[in-house]
Swiss-Prot record:
It comes from Kocuria rhizophila (strain ATCC 9341 / DSM 348 / NBRC 103217 / DC2201). Belongs to the PRA-PH family. It is an enzyme of class 3 (hydrolase). Keywords: Amino-acid biosynthesis, ATP-binding, Cytoplasm, Histidine biosynthesis, Hydrolase, Nucleotide-binding. One of its GO terms (molecular function) is phosphoribosyl-ATP diphosphatase activity. It catalyses: 1-(5-phospho-beta-D-ribosyl)-ATP + H2O = 1-(5-phospho-beta-D-ribosyl)-5'-AMP + diphosphate + H(+). GO terms for biological process: L-histidine biosynthetic process. The gene is hisE. This is Phosphoribosyl-ATP pyrophosphatase. It comes from the Bacteria. The lineage of its organism: Bacteria, Bacillati, Actinomycetota, Actinomycetes, Micrococcales. It holds the Pfam family PRA-PH. GO terms for cellular component: cytoplasm. It is found in: Cytoplasm.
Length: 87
């Protein structure tokens, strides 16, 4: 099972290596505006899944939102600690 920290490390490594065909790299190349659209889309899907779908489907949507939020963090040059200081 992957943790929030594991995912961030994996995505950071992909951002540094920039493997060809990586969806993470493509999203980073879309910039903050493009990533922001994905964050908003996924947030809406989380809401709808929590309202109308199973807990498993809601958890999957939440995991996708967390992925896109972490991509945004990387695009902005933020670390986990930058966010943790506000929790």
């Amino acid at each position: 099972m992957k943790t929030f920290e594991d995912l961030f490390a994996e995505l950071s490594a992909k951002a540094a290596r920039r493997p060809e065909g990586s969806k993470t790299v493509a999203e980073l190349d879309a910039g903050v505006h493009g990533i922001g659209k994905k964050v908003v889309e996924e947030a809406a899907e989380v809401w709808m899944a929590c309202e109308y779908e199973s807990d498993a489907e809601a958890a999957e949507e939440i995991s996708q939102l967390l992925y896109h939020v972490q991509v945004m963090m990387i695009a902005k040059g933020m670390s986990l600690e930058d966010v943790y200081t506000h929790l």
